[in-house]
């Protein structure tokens, strides 16, 4: 259905509505996904300055890209970073250096750029069955779900309060403030922490409020290339971009698939130099942005979100310092709750399909976290899943 163009009479209310949608989407992007970066980084031994530079890169550069693309196409094309990819990197950092990871980011960006420019994205995804990709994603994500469960032992009251709030908001389904359930859980968690002891951030000079991004010299190694490049590219194309594209198409937009892939690769080359992981089109954030009934104005909320992202990225040291000071159980709960639906979708996609055995093998091999030939398990999950599916499920293939 065609919408009437914005008029003076309704422009203020439309702009306000799009602004609020953008703010809600930003709260989501700046909470649990950032907590996942912090959790992965701390578990891998990265420094606070490394984490701050990572957050700067994925918010600031992608914020500018989101504004440019949304204005150009008059669609809500918001780009951030691949969350499954961040978890893959956390696993990889157990065996390779961060500089080698940076090298893999650059190669992934080049691969995505090539796939977008040649239009091979659809062919690649047709060759690699989605259930196998989802099996690999489930194997990577499941540890975050388990960490949330284990957090009950570490801090039962905090984790219970956050989890019950999350479930209660979902059950009521009609809260006066149209915020995602995760934001209510975040607010409850922050209140409890401040009531107890506050966030003990120590000395934090004003000069550290604005980020001083680090630049990295990439190192290229065969092990990092094999372990990360293909899995990262697959998560960008299949686990992230595909989700965002479906969200946009469902409300009548026509996102440029090959152009999106090309710009994901192009921007990944820049974010990598500052420690940022590969760029992707977002799914959940774009889903929030398109929740209004004015498709012709959705791009406005994407522009607002891009501005929020840039400002947030510039204050990355403050964000990093506060989140690192938070109790581990808080971060584990935030990340676990945020990934519940994604984990459910990954399991459903892996096993409720025509390639369940391939999905199962991909899941088990990835979950096992056993590196072979000095290459991490997510890569082997895809390899063995594809082989088993080809041998046992050829009749199910299209």
Annotate each language-model stretch with its function.
Residues 51, 57-58, 65-121:
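Membrane helical hairpin/interfacial module
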Residues 95-200, 305-398:
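Membrane-embedded alpha-helical modules
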Residues 2-15, 39-65, 230-299:
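Membrane-embedded helical hairpins/re-entrant loop segments and their flanking transmembrane helices
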